[in-house]
């Protein structure tokens, strides 16, 4: 069995009120177009064709080289859009899935069931349908007394009886590929909207006594077509629930799953504990046994097993096992932390590698640095890495001790087991086993404070 897929992505999406094409709006980290394309891969299509139109270059970039593309210059209806794909699929034997690019909730499992149903029943066309409590606005499935599908009627063309029908067209179909394009040559624009309806091919098939069927979705949410921001928010809510439920089934504990945002490509190992208001985005991986406390935000990062991240932000970073971060820490892109590193409250790290068991507990900035293992970085330490034009590197050896309130002016190297005195400004190399002191000598003037205006004795 050879399968093909057509994704309809040419529309502007006026009701979105956006400069961004509708299909490029995101749901749980992926564009609606990407969601549809990924779901369509469940049928293993030999060829996928995406129909583009409005801002076609931008939409094309959303799938890059994963699909063939055809251009619909004028948006003259769904039937006209599918006609554009004939140049790619004409004359091919097999079954063609047609899916709208604005239905992000449709699952691969449902599409696989749809095409299996189509093949097993030897249909020339199979419609994916759903039962709606309120069917207003949807195309209605019209059946005869024997329960056979005889046509699909759009809302504007439906009579009073048809408007009462609850079975609706989801806009997803499977067709015999050759018969699809033959039937499309017979449809007209003789309807309320003056468009070429793809749904009109159903009546054509029936007139030729060809078999048409319908596969009914179990979950109505999958049928959601996103046409405005309200529907986009609904899709986001449903997708978020799906994602958290998937992770819970796989052994992840959530204290308050309704408040957690996890994108589609995030991977979480079993026995992770996630508190409320946690955000996980992009290609993030969380290792087993890790704890993410309230307010943590992680994007495109790898967190090693058994780590504890407390109310902190982590971006494009790699953390080994047993790391502790926070509260209120910020790991910026390019940060690598080895095993059992501790990054404490109000510490910022950027573009740096920090060796195992090193600690930076408080109020510190480490940028463009190579820090060895078992280093103690005292509170208030700053790596001065930027001169207004270029960034420079600081290198700190193993077992070094950086005193509190040290200012390290790069480029700089501090050797193994070296020490900088608290309050020092260090701008020259500190050799192995050395102590560097870079501060003014303290001068104490006894009794002098009594001469100052703030002293209590001055108010008498």
UniProtKB/Swiss-Prot annotation:
Primary site of residence: cytoplasm
Known pathway: Nucleotide-sugar biosynthesis; UDP-N-acetyl-alpha-D-glucosamine biosynthesis; N-acetyl-alpha-D-glucosamine 1-phosphate from alpha-D-glucosamine 6-phosphate (route II): step 2/2; Nucleotide-sugar biosynthesis; UDP-N-acetyl-alpha-D-glucosamine biosynthesis; UDP-N-acetyl-alpha-D-glucosamine from N-acetyl-alpha-D-glucosamine 1-phosphate: step 1/1; Bacterial outer membrane biogenesis; LPS lipid A biosynthesis
Cofactor: Mg(2+)
Keyword match Transferase: yes
Keyword Cytoplasm appears in the UniProt entry: yes
This protein's GO CC annotations: cytoplasm; membrane
Chain spans, region N-acetyltransferase: 251-460
Binding site for Mg(2+): 102, 227
Keywords: Acyltransferase, Cell shape, Cell wall biogenesis/degradation, Cytoplasm, Magnesium, Metal-binding, Multifunctional enzyme, Nucleotidyltransferase, Peptidoglycan synthesis, Repeat, Transferase
Cofactor note: Binds 1 Mg(2+) ion per subunit.
Entry's family note: In the N-terminal section; belongs to the N-acetylglucosamine-1-phosphate uridyltransferase family. In the C-terminal section; belongs to the transferase hexapeptide repeat family.
Name under which the protein is recorded: Bifunctional protein GlmU
Gene: glmU
């Amino acid at each position: 069995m050879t399968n093909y897929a057509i994704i309809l992505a040419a529309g502007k999406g006026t009701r979105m009120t956006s400069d961004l094409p509708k299909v490029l709006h995101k749901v749980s980290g992926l564009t609606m177009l990407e969601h549809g394309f990924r779901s369509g891969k469940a049928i293993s299509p030999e060829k996928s064709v995406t129909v583009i139109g409005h801002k076609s270059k931008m939409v094309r970039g959303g799938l890059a080289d994963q699909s063939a593309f055809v251009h619909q210059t004028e948006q003259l209806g769904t039937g006209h859009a599918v006609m554009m794909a004939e140049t790619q699929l004409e004359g091919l034997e097999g079954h063609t899935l047609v899916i709208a690019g604005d239905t992000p909730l449709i699952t691969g499992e449902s599409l696989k069931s749809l095409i299996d149903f189509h093949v097993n029943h030897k249909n020339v066309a199979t419609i994916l349908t759903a039962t709606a409590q309120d069917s207003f606005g949807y195309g209605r499935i019209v059946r005869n007394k024997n329960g056979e599908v005889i046509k699909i009627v759009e809302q504007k063309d439906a009579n009073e009886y048809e408007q009462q029908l609850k079975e609706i067209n989801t806009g997803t179909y499977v067709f015999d590929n050759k018969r699809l394009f033959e039937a499309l040559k017979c449809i007209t624009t003789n309807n309320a909207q003056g468009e070429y309806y793809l749904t009109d091919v159903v009546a054509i098939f029936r007139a030729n006594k060809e078999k048409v069927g319908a596969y009914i979705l179990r979950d109505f949410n999958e049928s959601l077509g996103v046409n405005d921001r309200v529907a986009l928010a609904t899709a986001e809510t449903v997708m978020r629930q799906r994602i958290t439920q998937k992770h819970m089934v796989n052994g992840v504990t959530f204290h308050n799953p309704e408040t957690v945002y996890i994108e589609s490509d995030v991977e979480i190992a079993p026995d992770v504990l996630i508190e409320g208001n946690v955000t996980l985005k992009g290609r993030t991986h969380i290792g087993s046994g890790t704890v993410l406390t309230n307010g943590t935000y992680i994007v495109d990062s790898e967190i090693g097993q058994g780590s504890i991240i407390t109310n902190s932000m982590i971006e494009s970073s790699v953390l080994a096992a047993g790391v502790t971060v926070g509260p209120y820490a910020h790991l910026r892109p390019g940060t690598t932390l080895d095993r059992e590193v501790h990054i404490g409250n109000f510490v910022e790290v950027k573009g740096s590698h920090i060796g195992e068991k090193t600690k930076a507990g408080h109020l510190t900035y480490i940028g463009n640095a190579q820090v060895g293992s078992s280093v103690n970085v005292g509170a208030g330490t700053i790596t001065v890495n930027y001169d207004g034009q270029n960034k420079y590197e600081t290198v700190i050896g193993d077992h070094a001790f950086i005193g509190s309130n040290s200012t390290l002016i790069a480029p700089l190297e501090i050797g193994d087991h070296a020490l900088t005195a608290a309050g020092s400004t260090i701008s020259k190399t500190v050799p192995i086993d050395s102590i560097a002191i870079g501060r003014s000598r303290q001068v104490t003037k006894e009794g002098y404070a009594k001469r100052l205006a703030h002293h209590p004795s001055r108010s008498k």
